[in-house]
């Protein structure tokens, strides 16, 4: 067996679109940029393309490293590359930074052509369906009429699912990992707490903080801390941190004492240093609004009737943010419609973030699934 390798040094590309993009919120984006990366080679038949959809804080940088920043490794580098589950010797892999993002695609930090200033909070609300429409236009630009597969975890899984409903004829296979057909009330509640942390930060300035030369770092830090708790499992937090005290004994202060406090503050500070608060607000609302069954009276069976792809649905036993029960809802609806679907529930202790990790059972499953896809 070939030893897995990195795709090596990569470089992002930018596609500009002049054609207005109608949005589900009622607005229109007159023109926009999408930043993307590709790995592997598109075959002569243009039949080996795989789209990887990112989650809330992800980006187009799925695999490889940048020449000027070799420590910036793609967020799914353990999965994508020669000899890896998503093998770039076989597939042409595409990663896209979605609209509203903060990694180069048009978003709140971009200039609003109507005002000459950053969009800020005036950037229109975007939905998963809008993202998929924009991705489809990029596929057209690249000459890809049909994807061999579309894959994503968490919010990325929602995009993969939406692709099979919006463009069923353009998707051969879909992998929906650690995802759900819609958010629960509890999930929406977590997102709202995170948003309020940002919205009430004095440096938020109604979303126009760019013009003030500040960022709502305190709010974004707290939002990330709240979110990060939900990405981990109780068992994994207990095993990694337990009740360990940084100083060996209690010092009775509001400063950092427990190791888990130190970890959360570190993650929050790091996130606030590179992510955009408006993008966070926008993307959590995108999550909240996703509900393909809504226009079918809440009937998921009816909503998924349009799908024709072969599916892989994956959940993780300790994921309480998007529990296995939510994945099974998708599976049951697909089976009701007599679609080809494989389901796996992976026993992994890491919680929701398991879909990002190098779990042997998980990767073996994905390798076998991708191996069976004919291009």
Curated annotation (Swiss-Prot):
Residues marked Important for acyl-CoA specificity (site): 321
EC number(s) given by UniProt: 2.3.1.46
Catalytic reactions of this protein: L-homoserine + succinyl-CoA = O-succinyl-L-homoserine + CoA
Top-level taxonomic group: Bacteria
GO cellular component, one term: cytoplasm
Domain AB hydrolase-1: 48-358
InterPro entries per the UniProt record, alphabetical: AB_hydrolase_1 (IPR000073), AB_hydrolase_fold (IPR029058), HAT_MetX-like (IPR008220)
GO MF entry, a single one: homoserine O-acetyltransferase activity
Residues annotated to bind substrate: 224, 353
Pfam family, one: Abhydrolase_1
Pathway(s) the chain acts in: Amino-acid biosynthesis; L-methionine biosynthesis via de novo pathway; O-succinyl-L-homoserine from L-homoserine: step 1/1
UniProt-annotated location(s): Cytoplasm
Residues annotated as catalytic: 154 (nucleophile), 319, 352
GO BP field: homoserine metabolic process; methionine biosynthetic process
Enzyme class, first EC level, given as a word: transferase
Keyword set includes Ion transport: no
Keywords: Acyltransferase, Amino-acid biosynthesis, Cytoplasm, Methionine biosynthesis, Transferase
Functional description taken from the UniProt entry: Transfers a succinyl group from succinyl-CoA to L-homoserine, forming succinyl-L-homoserine.
Family under the similarity heading: Belongs to the AB hydrolase superfamily. MetX family.
PANTHER family xref list: HOMOSERINE O-ACETYLTRANSFERASE
HAMAP family according to UniProt: MetX_acyltransf
The protein, known as: Homoserine O-succinyltransferase
Protein's organism: Azoarcus sp. (strain BH72)
């Amino acid at each position: 067996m070939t030893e897995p390798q990195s795709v090596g040094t990569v470089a992002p590309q930018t596609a500009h679109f002049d054609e207005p993009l109608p949005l589900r919120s009622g607005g229109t984006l007159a023109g926009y940029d999408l930043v993307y990366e590709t790995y592997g080679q598109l075959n002569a038949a243009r039949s080996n393309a795989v789209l990887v959809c990112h989650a809330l804080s992800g980006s187009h940088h799925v695999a490889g490293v940048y020449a000027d920043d070799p420590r910036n490794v793609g967020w799914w580098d353990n999965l994508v590359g020669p000899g890896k589950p998503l093998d770039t010797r076989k597939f042409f892999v595409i990663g896209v930074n979605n609209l509203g993002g903060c990694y180069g695609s048009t978003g709140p930090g971009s200039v609003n052509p109507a005002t000459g200033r950053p969009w800020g909070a005036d950037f229109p609300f975007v939905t998963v369906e809008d993202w998929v429409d924009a991705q489809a236009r990029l596929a057209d630009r690249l000459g890809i009429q049909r994807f061999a597969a579309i894959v994503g975890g968490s919010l990325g899984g929602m995009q993969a699912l939406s692709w099979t409903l919006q463009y069923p004829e353009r998707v051969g296979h879909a992998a929906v990992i650690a995802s759900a057909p819609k958010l629960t009330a509890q999930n929406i509640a977590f997102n709202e707490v995170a948003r309020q942390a940002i919205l009430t930060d004095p440096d938020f300035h109604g979303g126009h903080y760019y013009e003030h030369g500040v960022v709502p770092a305190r709010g974004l830090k707290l939002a990330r801390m709240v979110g990060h708790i939900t990405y981990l499992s109780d068992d994994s937090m207990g095993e990694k941190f337990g009740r360990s005290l940084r100083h060996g004994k209690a010092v009775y202060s509001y400063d950092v004492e427990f190791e888990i406090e130190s970890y959360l503050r570190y993650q929050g500070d790091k996130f606030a240093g590179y992510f955009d608060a408006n993008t966070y607000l926008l993307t959590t609302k995108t999550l909240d609004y996703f509900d393909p069954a809504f226009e079918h009276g809440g009937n998921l069976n009816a909503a998924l009737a349009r799908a024709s792809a072969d599916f892989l649905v994956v959940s993780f036993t300790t994921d309480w943010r998007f529990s296995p029960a939510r994945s099974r809802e998708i599976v049951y609806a697909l089976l009701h419609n007599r679609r080809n679907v494989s389901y796996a529930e992976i026993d992994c202790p890491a919680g929701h973030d398991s879909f990002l990790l190098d779990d042997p059972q998980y990767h073996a499953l994905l390798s076998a699934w991708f191996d069976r896809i004919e291009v």
